[in-house]
Amino acid sequence: MARLARLRRWTARVACGGAVVIAGVVHVPAALAFPYRADFGSTTVLSEQPIDRAAMGRVLARADGLLATSPLYRTGLSRQVVLTDGGWRWDVLSIGVRNAIAFRRPFAHALVFNRSSVATDRVTNGAPLGGVRTLSGTIAHETTHRLVADHIGEWAALRLPAWKREGYPDYVAGETSIRPGDEALIRRLDPTAPVLTYYEGRRRVAAELARNGGSVDALLKD
């Protein structure tokens, strides 16, 4: 019995230690030793492929131009842009959100992207419908999540209804992953497809901002 108790304690410690390691990695992507790194002012880019500084600079400039349309934007925001090939590093980092095009973990400064192409300014999760966005627009989208969280608090941001939580970042990005001609097809195939939350949310946010005189503070109230 004593040996069994020791084994259980050892197993629990290993499981706890493994959970701590995983939690650390998903919040600190640099722990996965990305082979390429480049700094652009207060933005650090980690990548699985060589980084074309000129092309990446254009992508970031477009993203920041989109962000500048939001009253929440501030220059010099520290962030980490993590570009993957959709392989094992993505699988490790994206636990719980593996089908996403990109994501930001709460309380984290890292923005993590699925299969990315800097040269073409594209990022995809491989879905045949609603699976492609501009990389620059998606950087703007994920950075907006950070701006909202900084403005109203992480927990308040998480409690926002989905149409506000995802709709405002898409409004700032000026895009969703659904082409207008694909909306009807997606609704026929799956009326509850998560991608529709973004599409509908952006339209609702645009309508609400038009109604309230453009007040983002009013929009972000619960």
Residue ranges and their predicted role:
Residues 118-139, 154-160:
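Short pre-active-site segment immediately N-terminal to the catalytic Zn-binding motif
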Residues 57-64, 140, 166, 170, ...:
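Extracytoplasmic/secreted envelope proteins and their assembly/folding machinery
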Residues 151, 158-193:
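Post-HExxH zinc-binding segment in Zn-dependent metallohydrolases
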